[in-house]
């Protein structure tokens, strides 16, 4: 039997600039690397979306600088905040359409997608995060407003210390009572496309 790992409550001070737009929260990498910055935003979501407790969460991003570190933080906080399972794209990679598909396929309560779209990447570039809800779509304006309001008064967050997940190894891993499944997002999305399109027929068109 896998024993639960101890969680730690970390005292923090709110940041006043964590208002998400339609594409999520986008800032310079250096902003996200400030102490507690990402953790504050994640905790605000966990606090404002209590249905994430005991449910499945999807995680992944576009692979830009800081992606892997952010995913490790999100996993540690998901475990501390009572999520039952997380589905993660292998290597931490997951496009927005693929994440939306996985949220629906695995009946997840939501998902965190780490992307800044076409914005420049790298240590001096941009980073971003957005929360998608259980239908795979983006969070409503009402929800993002509640998350923002909560982020301005947040005083603590919950996390598991010393956790590490091998993002490159497909299959099931455990972090305390949290199940972590690393999936091949290309295979998953290709299977969806094969359901939607008749590729054999399309192949005939091009002959």
What is each residue range found by the language model?
Residues 23-25, 99, 147, 193:
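Bulky hydrophobic/aromatic "packing anchor" residues in well-ordered structure
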């Amino acid at each position: 039997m896998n024993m639960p790992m101890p969680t730690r409550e970390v005292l923090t001070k709110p940041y006043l600039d964590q208002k998400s737009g339609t594409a999520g929260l986008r800032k310079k990498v250096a902003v996200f690397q400030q102490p507690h910055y990402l953790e504050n935003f994640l905790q605000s979501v966990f606090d404002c979306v209590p249905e994430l407790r005991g449910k499945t969460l999807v995680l992944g991003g576009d692979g830009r600088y800081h992606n892997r570190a952010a995913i490790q933080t999100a996993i540690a906080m998901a475990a501390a905040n009572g999520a039952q399972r997380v589905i993660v794209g292998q290597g931490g990679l997951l496009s927005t359409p693929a994440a939306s598909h996985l949220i629906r396929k695995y009946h997840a309560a939501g998902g965190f997608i780490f992307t800044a779209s076409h914005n420049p990447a790298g240590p001096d570039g941009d980073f971003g995060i957005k929360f998608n809800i259980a239908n795979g779509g983006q969070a409503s304006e009402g929800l993002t407003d509640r998350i923002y309001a909560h982020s301005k008064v947040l005083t603590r967050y919950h996390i598991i210390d010393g956790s590490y997940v091998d993002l490159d190894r497909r299959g099931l891993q455990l972090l305390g009572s949290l199940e972590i499944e690393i999936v091949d997002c290309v295979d998953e999305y290709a299977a969806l496309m094969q359901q939607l399109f008749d590729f054999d027929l399309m192949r005939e068109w091009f002959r």
